């Protein structure tokens, strides 16, 4: 059996049958890749190939935050990579970490971009921003055109019966998840980001709140009030109490309270 003709000979025949002269040559850098050919074949068959989820595209453990965590000895590299994959951390083009807010159904609600210095603390001169805000700017949409419904950072990890610990900063949730893996660690994203409506996805779980500390007990008082408001709702299961930990209030020094440290800071300074 004779071998099939080479592709260029076949194209030459097609060229001649169309009245052209000489061999048919592809323009430079236009050779179709195998994966593109596969996509075209599926498209011709009427099959739909959904794009990768938004959080998958910039998934990275090399952002300024991840590097600072390893360099300061808060986690080793293996732990950092594991935590980055679990929390689906991203990285922007200008080296910010992206904290994706993903619910238990896998839906992305928003992404928070933050910058950290070499000491693993936030850069005060660079304010956090949101992916939805940047998208509105890019597509020239009015800022009031739509509002994202924020959820707890790390909510996608709450699936099986577990004890859920909620801290203020996303950074703390990521680090503590490797130090105390027996709990599922979520983050509110700020002192006043602990809002009652965010708790409805957690009404069947045991919840422990761990606010930051300060001299005036403002964080503890604020979070305690929110916990009481949630538990007093007639829709909240009465057997599921929300505990507000006063660990930092009892153990932090006066100087630490003045600096408004969180649990990660306390652990780092105690070792």
Predicted regions and their residues:
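Generic cytosolic/nucleocytoplasmic N-terminal low-complexity/intrinsically disordered segments
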Residues: 7, 15, 20, 28, ...
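Compositionally biased, intrinsically disordered low-complexity segments
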Residues: 4, 17, 72, 126, ...
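Helix N-terminus capping/helix-initiation residues
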Residues: 50, 153-154, 262
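TOPRIM metal-binding catalytic domain and adjacent DNA-binding surface shared by DnaG-type primases
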Residues: 2-109, 157-161, 271
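Short linear motifs in intrinsically disordered/low-complexity regions
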Residues: 9-10, 30, 41, 126, ...
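TOPRIM fold recognition
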Residues: 104, 161-164, 170-271
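Phosphate-handling DNA/RNA-contact segment within nucleic-acid enzymes
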Residues: 20, 92, 98-203
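Generic low-complexity segments that are intrinsically disordered, proline-rich and/or Lys/Arg-biased
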Residues: 4-6, 24, 28-29, 51-54, ...
